[in-house]
């Protein structure tokens, strides 16, 4: 299954707000059900609940079905909680790190910057959005022109207290923002509200 490229509002109306996909907030269809319609609503099955959790995770981080399945398989082979390791793997992707640092408003925006070779990790160009960031990595912008045209207003308006504790945003040098990875993210700092166990259960027979 390919990555979704259709209307984003359609997705968040169905799956509720997904900060990585869009910064627009909308009321979900579930909250718009009228009193007369509530009595005829179908009870959601356990499979449906797990499917929705999986879809929320996939669309928030902009993954294909195959990519997410591969991440689940990697998480299953690692020591520790499969669900938490899965979230950690997704959060430490370069495209998500840029988003959490406030360089860009959404993960798709981050992916575009990376694909255009504007992002450096430890002074080396990285053009792979799925690049796994590690502690002590330093993320910078490839050129001042790129920063001025795309990121100036975004960085200046982004409150540093919005950056999670495992990351540090440095604005000490004019027009040269830097992002530092302090350590691997913990569960409390995950940006998406989700029950990751439902996703693990969904893939229990596939991974």
From Swiss-Prot:
The keyword RNA-binding appears for this protein: yes
GO BP field: ribosomal small subunit biogenesis; translation
Gene Ontology cellular-component annotations: chloroplast; small ribosomal subunit
GO molecular function terms noted in the UniProt entry: rRNA binding; structural constituent of ribosome
Keywords, alphabetical: Chloroplast, Plastid, Ribonucleoprotein, Ribosomal protein, RNA-binding, rRNA-binding
Disulfide bonds: none
Subcellular location(s) per record: Plastid, Chloroplast
Cross-referenced Pfam families: Ribosomal_S4, S4
S4 RNA-binding domain span: 92-150
InterPro entries xref list: Ribosomal_uS4, Ribosomal_uS4_bac-type, Ribosomal_uS4_CS, Ribosomal_uS4_N, S4_RNA-bd, S4_RNA-bd_sf
Family classification: Belongs to the universal ribosomal protein uS4 family.
NCBIfam families xref list: PRK05327.1, rpsD_bact
Quaternary structure note: Part of the 30S ribosomal subunit. Contacts protein S5. The interaction surface between S4 and S5 is involved in control of translational fidelity.
Function: One of the primary rRNA binding proteins, it binds directly to 16S rRNA where it nucleates assembly of the body of the 30S subunit.
Protein name: Small ribosomal subunit protein uS4c
Lineage, top ranks: Eukaryota, Viridiplantae, Streptophyta, Embryophyta, Tracheophyta
Gene name of this polypeptide: rps4
